[in-house]
UniProtKB/Swiss-Prot annotation:
Coiled coil: none
Family: Belongs to the ABC transporter superfamily. Phosphonates importer (TC 3.A.1.9.1) family.
Protein name: Phosphonates import ATP-binding protein PhnC 1
NCBIfam families reported in the protein's UniProt record: ABC_phnC
Free-text function comment from the UniProt entry: Part of the ABC transporter complex PhnCDE involved in phosphonates import. Responsible for energy coupling to the transport system.
Amino acid sequence: MIELKNVSKVYPNGVIGLDNINLTIEKGEFVAIVGLSGAGKSTLLRAMNRLIDISDGDIMINRRSITSASGKELRMMRRDIGMIFQNFNLVKRSTVLRNVLSGRVAHNHTFRTLFNLFPQKDVDLALQSLERVNILEKAYTRSSQLSGGQQQRVSIARALAQEAKMILADEPTASLDPVTTKQVMDDLKKINTEDQVTVVINLHFVDLAREYATRIIGLRDGKVVFDGPAQRATDEVFKDIYGRPLKEDELLGKEVG
């Protein structure tokens, strides 16, 4: 469970990133966060994992405050949170397998992981994770040789190997073509339904949010302006979230179907 209580973020230049956010996300939900660029989507997601510090309020992960956590407690809390970024965050010169094994770092002694000395059970788990996202054949390929879609699937495999209880995905399909976008979204949905892993994802494309999410949260100027089931997110609702009618480039279109 993720709980945000009166969460605000004000940047040093005075820009308000988040404005008194109150949310509860239950285990096993698939939540899409939508809104215009600058609405606070990335700020919200990064605050959940303490990649940025909030200015006010509290964020609870499974009833423990990540806002006040530090040291070992913070590391242990982050171990349960898988992050997937738009730019993949892979070590390009390393093999796919080594990138996936990085998801096991928090489960092992630091000295061993510095020298890539992982137990065989971790290697087996990493290979199984690659198989689940249909990219096992690339295990010993350098990550720099993969397409964007393949790199994003490696990121998902890393979260699987991490045995994350929740996945936070920051516009993971933004740089992908429609076919690859569907593959990545299918992978995330499968993990959500089969493993009961909570997924919170920032999305640009409105129709993707409607198709894959069970719940949609709309942000505007750092505030929650919509929070409800995906089926209630009509074009009129999105007009309210965005403050204007939808544009063509905010719909991926029939190519995904």
